[in-house]
Structure formats: structure tokens, C-alpha cells
Amino acid sequence: SSIRKFDLARIEEEMVYIAKRCKKSDELIITDLNFGMYQQDVETAKSLANTMQKYNWPIHLSAAAGKNKPDRLIEIASILDGAWIIGSAMESSDTDVLKAIKRGNISKKAFNKVLEHGNNSSPYAQTYTEIILAIPKDSKETHFNSIRYGMKHEAKIIRMFQAILLLGTEMATQKTRDEHELETQYRVIPGSAGLYKFFDEKIPITEIEEIIVGNSTMSFEDYLDCRLMNLIVESFYNNAMFEEIYAFLYEMDILPLDIFVYLKDHPKIYPPKIKQIMDDFIVSNKKNLFKTRKELEDFALNEKTIKKFIDAEIGINEILVGKSSLYSQFESMVELLITSVSGYLRENDKMSACTQHYLNELGRFTVFR
């Protein structure tokens, strides 16, 4: 098979056209799911760098990186001089999971090389990796291990996604569903509900997707536990607000995930408002799911319910709402994190009076900063 490509002259012309007219956005999104795989991408990067230098646009570049071409990715990232945040989607770090989804993943050596370059390129680097929850053969253990793998290789951002069954894909076939005992439910995509007027009639419309919430190796309860961990990682890890605390942990050969597991498994240490946010998060994850498409359509496709979707009373992005709610309790977040670190260290005979004093001071510094 062959890949159709635009010639470089056309690409240059289009970038200049956009740069001259773009006034309200500093970001360019390249809709190539494997940018950096081919030599032409290097030439595109050089052209883009010239455009950036001449027009001071774009400031940021968003593009999904190709896999198993680390040297080329690094070359392109160097050409773009920090404008492109590099990382790689690994879906899972588990070999059996990758085999089940027939995914030729980026090699561990290449993965590490890309992240190392990205992290060394700037003190403010935001390298990333991406993981998908509940795909065939995934389990609570393998999902947590994938998060651990990303942290071990110092990915600054770990993006965790739910598995969507797309019509026409192999994963959505009855054969795959049966083979891996996929448990699925339906939901309205957050922000994808509206009431539209056609002539004299108001028609409620939603966009519905089917997601995997369990399989032969992951129960629904394990799925919810993983979702809670995803909220913790997104809120406590991804935004670099606690990087001094994690730097201290790395010096002790402790990964942030070790602390997050302790935090998740000890709800009795949660400050009251944090406890309520965590509980509401789990409730929302259950409430927004429906066993069948018909059940969801019967519930959603009426004017009263659609207005609730529009007003974000229902059908919310649970991670986004949970994260923003946690940030509104920032001092309590710091208190909980320091308490979790202290508890983990005591549990593993690594605590001392000096360490406890340092942690307390580190917590105060984080709040006052």
C-alpha cells in the first residue's frame, strides 16, 4: 500500500497562509497520528520552524508522535526547539495486553530515549505517555503497572483514556467481545447533547458512545478502582504542582504511584470535603452509564433531560469535574498527600523525625507557593 502526501511547497504555502491570518490561537494541530515516522516530516518541521521564526506563530505544536523512530522524533523536536511536546502512546506496558489488541508498541528502549530527550530539552518539559483502560487482557494490576512504567521513565504527564468501541473496528466485533468477555455500557459523550430547532419542531440530539467497563481479567469494581486512580494521577501528578514532593520521593527510590495506591486504599485519612469529592466521582461514573443504547436513548432524548445535559447537571466529564473540585480544596490536597507519604514511609520503615519535619516543611512550602 502507498501513503499519499502533499508536496512540501503546498505545506509551506498553507502554513504561511494560516500564520498571516491566525490572531486568536497560538497553537497548530497536525492531524497526523504518526507524525515523525517519515523523512518528509523532517522537511515539514524545517519549514514550520522557518514559519515560526518569521511570523512568531505557532508557539505550540500539537501532533501525535509516531512510534519506533526515536532518532527522527528527536531530530524533529530539536528542529522545533521546544514547540512540540513529545511523548508516546503506549496503551499498556503489558506484553499480553498489547498482543491481545494486536498492537506493535513502541519499544521500551525507544520510549525511554524519546522521553529522556524531551525532559532534557527544557526545565519546563511536559513529556507524556498515554494509556487506555480496560482493553482486552487489561487488569487492575496491568493498568497500575502501565502508570508505574510511565512514572519510572519520568513522563511528566500520563494521559489515561477509556476504551471506546468504534463501529467497524476489530475490537467491536462479536468475536472479540466473546473472546475477551468484554463488558460494555453506553454514555452520552460529555458536551455532545443539544436541542435543535428544525422548522417548528425542537429535536433533542445526543452523541452516544459504547465504552468497555470490564473484561475477562477486569471486573466492573476493578474498573471503578482504576478510574479513581486515574483521577488521583490526573489531579496530583499531571500538573507539576507537587514536583518538589515527588523529587524527594525519587531520591528515596519511591515512585509517586506507590503513594497514590496508599492514598486510594486509605479513605479514612481523607479530609471530609476530599472524601465527598471522591465519593461523588464514583457515583458519577456509575450514573452516567447505561446497559443498552435503547435504555440511554429512552432516558436522554427528551427536552427536559437534554437541558440537564446542556447545563452539566448530568453527563459530565467525571475526571475534569473531579479535578477542578479537588483543586478548590488545594490545602486539603496537600494535607492528604503529605499524610499519605508519611503513612507509606512509616509502613515501610523509612520514616524518621528528620524526614517528618522535612515533609511538613515541604507541605507548607507547596501551599504558600
Specify the residue positions occupied by each region the protein language model found.
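Conserved SAM/AdoMet-binding glycine-rich loop
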Residues: 8-129, 133-136
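Flexible glycine/acidic-rich beta-alpha junction loops that bind and position SAM and/or redox cofactors
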Residues: 34, 38-39, 96-102, 133-142, ...
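Radical SAM enzyme core and accessory elements
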Residues: 210-369
